């Protein structure tokens, strides 16, 4: 069984027991969260596709960790001017563990 969920403006294919990193979510480590924006639920040969979301579909997960990605360095170089500007950015993320997938399949 797997599902496709939407969170943080991105779509993720998830299975029960899977760990994945998503955009930063509010909550403490160990909190249970539910994703209601389920785009697809599949169990074996049975598939339910939402328009845009599956009615009654939800995915429960547990927050495992909060962290920050590796640093990305941005360089703005001005040719012939002997100048450049450097800037770094680290994006926050939340690591979650998928517990259950709920949703009826056709």
Curated annotation (Swiss-Prot):
GO terms for cellular component: cytoplasm; ribonucleoprotein complex; ribosome. PROSITE patterns: RIBOSOMAL_L21. It comes from the Bacteria. SUPFAM superfamilies: L21p-like (SSF141091). Keywords: Ribonucleoprotein, Ribosomal protein, RNA-binding, rRNA-binding. GO terms for biological process: translation. InterPro entries: bL21-like (IPR028909), bL21-like_sf (IPR036164), Ribosomal_bL21 (IPR001787), Ribosomal_bL21_CS (IPR018258). One of its GO terms (molecular function) is rRNA binding. Belongs to the bacterial ribosomal protein bL21 family. PANTHER family: 50S RIBOSOMAL PROTEIN L21, LARGE RIBOSOMAL SUBUNIT PROTEIN BL21M. Part of the 50S ribosomal subunit. Contacts protein L20. This protein binds to 23S rRNA in the presence of protein L20. This is Large ribosomal subunit protein bL21. It comes from Dichelobacter nodosus (strain VCS1703A).
């Amino acid at each position: 069984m797997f599902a496709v969920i939407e969170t943080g403006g991105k779509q993720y294919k998830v299975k029960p027991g899977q760990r994945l990193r998503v955009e930063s979510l509010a909550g403490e480590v160990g909190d249970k969260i539910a994703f209601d924006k389920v785009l697809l639920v599949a169990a074996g040969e049975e598939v339910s596709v939402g328009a845009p979301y599956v009615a009654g579909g939800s995915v429960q997960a547990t927050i495992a960790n909060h962290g920050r990605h590796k640093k990305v360095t941005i360089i703005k170089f001005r040719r012939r001017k002997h100048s450049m500007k450097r800037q770094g950015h680290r994006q926050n993320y939340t690591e979650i563990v998928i517990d259950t997938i709920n949703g009826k399949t056709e």
